[in-house]
Amino acid sequence: MSDVSYREITAKGLWSNNPALVQLLGLCPLLAVSSSVVNALGLGIATLLVLVISNSFVSLIRRQVSDAVRLPAFVMIIASAVTCTELLMKAFTYELYQILGLFIPLIVTNCAVLGRADAFASKNKLIPSAVDGFMMGLGFMLVLVAVGAVRELLGTGHLFGDMHLIFGEGARSWQLNIFGADYPNVIFALLPPGAFIVVGMLIAAKNSIDAHLKKRADARKTAVSTGSKRVRTTGAVS
């Protein structure tokens, strides 16, 4: 694939076809787990790993699997990737794994993962498929972290609490107390309805930016079209 194609894959994963903000996939973990940055980052990294692994293996076997058993084969690959990721989390971030709980195995049912395997990896070579999985996973993780940051800030008044669950004891000092000890915690932000509102605001912001960019692009096209139609006239007109 050309560089232009890789740029397109990146743009789609991070923005124009973002699994959370555009496709609205994976909303269950997005709403349930994103109560803090550390939870969101943990689930986001796990989902990213599963996407890269599953896309890569689906691409490798795409010509050996018939259409009749395509989807069951993809689900088995995804389940294997989730199991490997789950074992890694148990080994290195056990406390975070206990907090995320059931939502790690539920990555198997995330439509974003199966959708990329079927729509992209089963039709493309290994490297583009791995890049697609990485970018889609990164786009999903960034939305998770953004939602988690807003909810944690509004709900507790601080950011980056409990980051030692991922990065070790040295990360305990990363916590930023933004609003101070007297901040009246907005508990609503930590509940699922608060997550719905934050996600809705992010979707609205993205749609507003897209509309603004489209308006500017249309205005630029109109200006170019008008300029090309101008005709210079010289001499007297009788």
Curated annotation (Swiss-Prot):
Its EC number is 7.-.-.-. GO terms for cellular component: plasma membrane. It is found in: Cell inner membrane. Keywords: Cell inner membrane, Cell membrane, Electron transport, Membrane, Translocase, Transmembrane, Transmembrane helix, Transport. InterPro entries: NqrDE/RnfAE, RnfE. It is a multi-pass membrane protein. It comes from the Bacteria. GO terms for biological process: electron transport chain. The chain crosses the membrane at residues 20-40, 41-61, 72-92, 95-115, 130-150, 185-205. Belongs to the NqrDE/RnfAE family. Part of a membrane-bound complex that couples electron transfer with translocation of ions across the membrane. The complex is composed of six subunits: RnfA, RnfB, RnfC, RnfD, RnfE and RnfG. This is Ion-translocating oxidoreductase complex subunit E. It comes from Cellvibrio japonicus (strain Ueda107). The lineage of its organism: Bacteria, Pseudomonadati, Pseudomonadota, Gammaproteobacteria, Cellvibrionales. The gene is rnfE.
